[in-house]
Amino acid sequence: VTSITLNLANPTAGQYSSFVDKIRNNVRDP
């Protein structure tokens, strides 16, 4: 849980891009 929190608090560019892509996919295909 701690590592996940740290990743959310300090996401790398790659992690952020992947996160955004997942959201966009969810919006397109709910």
Curated annotation (Swiss-Prot):
One of its GO terms (biological process) is negative regulation of translation. GO terms for molecular function: rRNA N-glycosylase activity; toxin activity. It catalyses: Endohydrolysis of the N-glycosidic bond at one specific adenosine on the 28S rRNA. The keyword Hydrolase applies. Its EC number is 3.2.2.22. The keyword Hydrolase applies. Keywords: Hydrolase, Plant defense, Protein synthesis inhibitor, Toxin. Expressed in seeds. InterPro entries: Ribosome-inact_prot_sf. SUPFAM superfamilies: Ribosome inactivating proteins (RIP) (SSF56371). Belongs to the ribosome-inactivating protein family. Type 1 RIP subfamily. Exhibits N-glycosylase activity. Catalyzes the release of one adenine from a ribosome. Acts as a ribosome-inactivating protein and inhibits protein synthesis in a rabbit-reticulocyte lysate system and in various cell lines (in vitro). This is rRNA N-glycosylase. It comes from Saponaria ocymoides (Rock soapwort). The lineage of its organism: Eukaryota, Viridiplantae, Streptophyta, Embryophyta, Tracheophyta.
